[in-house]
Structures are given as C-alpha cells and as structure tokens.
From Swiss-Prot:
<dbReference type="InterPro" id="IPR018161">
    <property type="entry name" value="Wnt_CS"/>
</dbReference>
<keyword id="KW-0272">Extracellular matrix</keyword>
<feature type="disulfide bond">
    <location>
        <begin position="304"/>
        <end position="314"/>
    </location>
</feature>
<comment type="similarity">
    <text>Belongs to the Wnt family.</text>
</comment>
<dbReference type="GO" id="GO:0005125">
    <property type="term" value="F:cytokine activity"/>
</dbReference>
<keyword id="KW-0964">Secreted</keyword>
<feature type="disulfide bond">
    <location>
        <begin position="133"/>
        <end position="141"/>
    </location>
</feature>
<dbReference type="InterPro" id="IPR005817">
    <property type="entry name" value="Wnt"/>
</dbReference>
<keyword id="KW-0217">Developmental protein</keyword>
<dbReference type="GO" id="GO:0030182">
    <property type="term" value="P:neuron differentiation"/>
</dbReference>
<feature type="lipid moiety-binding region" description="O-palmitoleoyl serine; by PORCN">
    <location>
        <position position="223"/>
    </location>
</feature>
<protein>
    <recommendedName>
        <fullName>Protein Wnt-5a</fullName>
    </recommendedName>
</protein>
<dbReference type="GO" id="GO:0045165">
    <property type="term" value="P:cell fate commitment"/>
</dbReference>
<feature type="glycosylation site" description="N-linked (GlcNAc...) asparagine">
    <location>
        <position position="291"/>
    </location>
</feature>
<dbReference type="GO" id="GO:0005109">
    <property type="term" value="F:frizzled binding"/>
</dbReference>
<feature type="disulfide bond">
    <location>
        <begin position="219"/>
        <end position="226"/>
    </location>
</feature>
<feature type="glycosylation site" description="N-linked (GlcNAc...) asparagine">
    <location>
        <position position="99"/>
    </location>
</feature>
Amino acid sequence: MASRYLTLAAALLASFLQVDIEANSWWSLAMNPVQIPEAYIVGAQPLCSQLAGLSPGQKKLCQLYQDHMQYIGEGAKTGIKECQYQFRHRRWNCSTVDNISVFGRVMQIGSRETAFTYSISAAGVVNAVSRACRAGELSTCGCSRARRPKDLQRDWLWGGCGDNLDYGYRFAKEFVDAREREKIHQKGSYESSRTLMNLHNNEAGRRTVYNLADVACKCHGVSGSCSLKTCWLQLADFRKVGDFLKEKYDSAASMKLNSRGKLVQVNSRFNPPTTNDLVYVDPSPDYCVRNESTGSMGTQGRLCNKTSEGMDGCELMCCGRGYDQFKTVQTERCHCKFHWCCYVKCKKCTEIVDQFVCK
C-alpha cells in the first residue's frame, strides 16, 4: 500500500512540472462553441489565434481547415457528455471546471480516468467530422467513398450518402494527436510516458468509432416489398461507443516505460494491450475527498442510492462518511391518454420523494 502511494506521489510531482504543457486543451472548444464570422472566411489567422487551448500545430490546422473547428468543438462536447453519462454513478463523474483545462488538474495524472477521457474525446471528433462530411458542411469532404462490403448481397445497391468515416478518422488523428507529437521530452521521462499513453488512448477511441460503424440499408419496391435495397456506411450510435470504451476502462492495462523508452505492461503475465485497449501509467487518486492538488472534487453533496450495493450506493459513493436525507417534490407526466387523431394528452402529477446526499 505504501509503495502505491509513493508511486502516485512521484507521478503527481512529475505531472506538476508539466502544468504549463497540460493546462490548455482543445477540449475547451466544447465549452465555447466556435462561430465563424463571414469576415474570417478568407483570413483564418484572427479566428484561430482567438481560440483558446490550441497547440501551435493545431492552430496551423485551424488556419487550413477553419470550417472544421465548429465540428471539433461539437465532437469534444459529445465526448464530454458521454463521459459524464458513463460515470454518473462513480465517485469520479467526469465533472468539468470553469477554465480552459476543462477537467482541471485531474488530467495531469495518467490514470485510467484520464485514459477514458482522451479516448472518448478523440472518438467524438471522428464522429462529428464524419457526419459533417456527409451533411455537406465541410469544403474538403463529402459522402463516404468506402468500398462495397464483400458480404453485401449482389443485387443490393451500394450507394446513398454514408458517413465519411475514412476522412473523419484521418482528420481526427491529425488534429487531436498534433499536440502530443509536437512535444519533445527526454527519453525515459515521465512526460514521455504520458505522451505515449495519450497517443495510444486517442487511437483506441478513433478505432472504436471505426470498428463499430456498420452498413445501413433502405428498402425500395412496390408496396414495401423490399425487392431492392440501397445500402451505405453508417456510424454507430455514440452511446455504443461510450459503452465499449467504458468496458475498456474497466479492463485498462497498467503500463510503464522500459529501457528503450517504450510502454510495456507492468504485469508481464497478462497479454499485452491491443490498439483497441486503454492504457494508463499512474494509479487513480482518491476521489472520496476534495483535493485541489490532484483535482479531485470529492463526493460530498453527491446524490446516492440508499438501497443500491453498487458504486452509486450511499455506502460506496460516500466512502463510509454517511449521508443526509431530505425530501423533494418531483413533477412528472401521468395519466396519459391517446386522442384520435393524433396526439397524447397527459396530466401533471407531483409526489414527495426521499433523496440522499453524501456528507
């Protein structure tokens, strides 16, 4: 146990040395939606210089692809929302802070929570840019040009306007990874391990979106006979991406640097992680109590479930500190009836319910 905390302390010390490097993030585009004034369409420099959180390489990409920036922000926002959904019942609930770091100091620790955040954010950008291509919102891409799947029935048409996953993947890789690739760290340093970790998890997020995409089809024919189908490539619902990466979070691999400056698994008895797995280099901090040095917001004041034995239960969520009970009034729709034709009319019902919050 003592060695675990010594490892965490060393990681924290190392991470604080790179505060300036990690303090700004492109994730901030999610918090401040990008608006592109008409006057900036020709001259990109004013717009890109005003966007907080971009690295030098990302600013150059912004100048070349400024119409993409809105969708990078949308992708980051999608990733953050999905992160908060997946961790809504955990001590760390992917909460954001009111500055351009978005998540605060907690991202300076190379924990499995950081691994998930990087992966889901990168996935969000692939998702948003791929859809924007299909919708004709971007000047450099259009509908998907993916090859016809070999197992598609011969009499089905391959066409339509699919999500441009190939373009979304390539652009997300170029933009999101730019910050990591332009860093120069001493071989074998903690910072170099974080860079390798971030790049690996970014790729895992992108691959998840790519691998979960599937063929969608529309029927054609007399009276809905479906004698002919037109098919195209379609992204999976982003909830599936979040569910998949959450499973990878639960089984994430603990890594360390070897003498050659490569990440290797701490426990060599396990199979090495694949490009679809998440990796981390630091143990998670204590999320039970508020700690400004680690970025933990603690669980005081969090709602908990008195009857649950899971992570959302009061015993685990409150870390044994106990909980307070209070009553609240909830209003919801009730006694709904369908009226011909065609609407549903409901009444509003109120009830007093017990809620529990951690001390």
